[in-house]
From Swiss-Prot:
Part of the 50S ribosomal subunit. It holds the Pfam family Ribosomal_L31. Belongs to the bacterial ribosomal protein bL31 family. Type B subfamily. GO terms for biological process: translation. GO terms for cellular component: ribonucleoprotein complex; ribosome. PROSITE patterns: RIBOSOMAL_L31. Keywords: Ribonucleoprotein, Ribosomal protein. Transmembrane segments: none annotated. It comes from Staphylococcus saprophyticus subsp. saprophyticus (strain ATCC 15305 / DSM 20229 / NCIMB 8711 / NCTC 7292 / S-41). This is Large ribosomal subunit protein bL31B. One of its GO terms (molecular function) is structural constituent of ribosome.
Amino acid sequence: MRQNIHPEYHNVIFLDTTTDFKFLSGSTKTSSETMEWEDGNEYPVIRLDISSDSHPFYTGRQKFAAADGRVERFNKKFGFKSSNE
């Protein structure tokens, strides 16, 4: 493997700002902000807007849109009665 062409891989703390959930993982991304982890070491912190702890798909709070067709949506939007009524 060639030297000095690969990004540096190190441990970082990913912090979900929505739920304050933290997890330690390896990454090539870095930050000037650091935080102490449970093992007593300081690691760079990467702030996330969403993670598996706050994403609706993983938390079970996902909403499914109604499966209306295009004609039904058009009729509803412009106040027409559907043919089924």
